Amino acid sequence: MILNDKTIRKYISEGLLEINPLDDIQIQPSSVDLRLGNEFLIYPEDIEIIDVRDPYFSNRLIKEIATEEGFIIKPKQFVLATTIEYIKLPDFLTAFVEGRSSLGRLGLFIENAGWVDAGFEGNITLEFYNANSIPIKIYPGMRICQLVFAKMEDRSEKPYRGKYQGQRGTTASRIFLDRD
């Protein structure tokens, strides 16, 4: 069941769902608008290969802090970013990260791993791809995506406690920690 605005507000007021900071204007009929943080991770153009087993690969990413003047995503560029909001989901809610259609219509694809497991806590790392042939300029603090909440039939027996639990800011891939 997708949560409506009334239930989202109720869960927040009861402390079951945490989203910080949050202004009531961000709560939509069936989602919550999340805003863009100012921290970006960029893949350098001189990287020849990404080795998923290399635990030091993320050290090669370039960290940029955007100002109110904005951040430019080049054509065909992939960039990691973060939300301002820190969220904490209970063990009976899951969430989907959805890009805003207004940005999609400009060619900016937001997230390609948009599932948030029950029990997750942290900032949401966003994956951006500029599919356009011209640069796109975005700004810290702007509404960048929507979080849609779904109530599960029952509480999760094993809520999320994975490698991204508690992440703050833009977080690079930690795939090298996978056991498979």
Swiss-Prot record:
Homotrimer. The record marks G114, W115 as: Important for bifunctional activity. Keywords: Hydrolase, Nucleotide metabolism, Nucleotide-binding. Bifunctional enzyme that catalyzes both the deamination of dCTP to dUTP and the hydrolysis of dUTP to dUMP without releasing the toxic dUTP intermediate. This is dCTP deaminase, dUMP-forming. The keyword Hydrolase applies. Signal peptide: none annotated. CDD domains: trimeric_dUTPase (cd07557). DCTP binds at R100, S101, S102, L103, G104, R105, D117, T125, L126, E127, Q146, Y160, Q167. PANTHER family: DCTP DEAMINASE. It is an enzyme of class 3 (hydrolase). Belongs to the dCTP deaminase family. The active site is at E127. GO terms for molecular function: dCTP deaminase (dUMP-forming) activity; dCTP deaminase activity; nucleotide binding. Its EC number is 3.5.4.30. SUPFAM superfamilies: dUTPase-like. It catalyses: dCTP + 2 H2O = dUMP + NH4(+) + diphosphate. NCBIfam families: dCTP_deam. InterPro entries: dCTP_deaminase, dUTPase-like_sf, dUTPase_trimeric. Pfam families: DCD (PF22769). It comes from the Bacteria. Pathway: Pyrimidine metabolism; dUMP biosynthesis; dUMP from dCTP: step 1/1. One of its GO terms (biological process) is nucleobase-containing small molecule interconversion.
